[in-house]
């Protein structure tokens, strides 16, 4: 019983206190709470602007207040100089009404001007009607220092929060224009020696000649007529320059590198062309078709030497590498073509075909006579050697047989 009596007494006391609190709320609807917030930010940046700046003056006015709220701030004029320092101190005491817990909000202010600014010691009060008409700062940021200010805002039941942007530029303030794309590119583009770090396309040197002869690399060159082959050639090409001096004539050799050569051409029903272009020169081969035969009718070339900047060119008309249409022509031995008095072209291990193709492969192979002229003497020598060896063996056997008869 005593315990129950104590509990009833406690409940009655709580009811009386709650009833009195509600009566007080009705009589005094304005319950005051105070929040004092001070944010101090110090920023110092030393930078040298890309362009000389004239002396300019900027003012900043702090704005916003709701009912009994007030905000204090101060701003002094700033002078822009060639070498800029920023020292910014801002004290923002804020007093608001609050009955609810306080929440944290982070504010970020960005400045782009390289300036020397000291903010302190003025006070301004703004009516409640101007809060919703606060203009935002027009200053835009590009590669600038950033001040991080952490503030606190309170929310009342059924009321709006204070705006996050509280700074408005005065009519006398000078703002920085928005940087254009060309300005940003010019600032980020390296100048002077830094430009050497940019990548560049390597230049292929012009032909350099040697005084000795060496086998040329075999390359495969094709010309397409739509999706079908028109010309296909596998060969090694060397250009020889003959220079006549006061005492004697010297020859300089240049082998065409297939990896540095671009093949192109023109396909026709009677004439087709193969163009081989490389740094410092080119070669042109013309194929002509007559009835069921085709052949190489013209060869031309030009070449520029890198060290002397001399250009050699020539063209020769002939009828060579003749074969049947649909067949391919092959010649392993070297073939020399005199293009001019000072320019000569040599081909080696050549295998080519023009006009009619079946698929992407060569047709029936027709070999050149020069290959036969090389092979026939070799075959003749081998036959003679075999005959001599056979005669020697025959004589040795006859001698053995004659000695055996004498013993009997």
Swiss-Prot record:
Annotated GO CC locations: alveolar lamellar body membrane; cell surface; early endosome; early endosome membrane; late endosome membrane; lysosomal membrane; perinuclear region of cytoplasm; plasma membrane
InterPro entries registered for this protein in UniProt: Lamp2-like_luminal, Lysosome-assoc_membr_glycop
Positions of glycan attachment: 55, 225, 284
Gene from which this protein is expressed: Lamp3
Keyword Endoplasmic reticulum: no
Name of the featured protein: Lysosome-associated membrane glycoprotein 3
Main location: other
Membrane-topology annotation of the record: Single-pass type I membrane protein
Keywords carried by this UniProt record: Adaptive immunity, Cytoplasmic vesicle, Disulfide bond, Endosome, Glycoprotein, Immunity, Lysosome, Membrane, Signal, Transmembrane, Transmembrane helix
Physiological role: Lysosomal membrane glycoprotein which plays a role in the unfolded protein response (UPR) that contributes to protein degradation and cell survival during proteasomal dysfunction. Plays a role in the process of fusion of the lysosome with the autophagosome, thereby modulating the autophagic process. Promotes hepatocellular lipogenesis through activation of the PI3K/Akt pathway. May also play a role in dendritic cell function and in adaptive immunity.
Assembly description: Monomer. Interacts with FURIN.
Gene Ontology biological process terms in this record: adaptive immune response; establishment of protein localization to organelle; lipid metabolic process; negative regulation of proteasomal protein catabolic process; positive regulation of gene expression; regulation of autophagy; regulation of viral life cycle; response to interferon-alpha
Disulfide bonds: 230-267, 331-368
PANTHER family to which the protein is assigned, alphabetical: LYSOSOME-ASSOCIATED MEMBRANE GLYCOPROTEIN (PTHR11506), LYSOSOME-ASSOCIATED MEMBRANE GLYCOPROTEIN 3 (PTHR11506:SF30)
Intracellular or extracellular location(s): Cell surface; Lysosome membrane; Cytoplasmic vesicle membrane; Early endosome membrane
Residues spanning the membrane: 374-394
Cytoplasmic topology ranges: 395-408
Superkingdom, taxonomy of origin: Eukaryota
Keyword Transmembrane helix: yes
Gene3D superfamilies linked: 2.40.160.110
Organism listed in the record: Rattus norvegicus
Leader sequence segment: 1-20
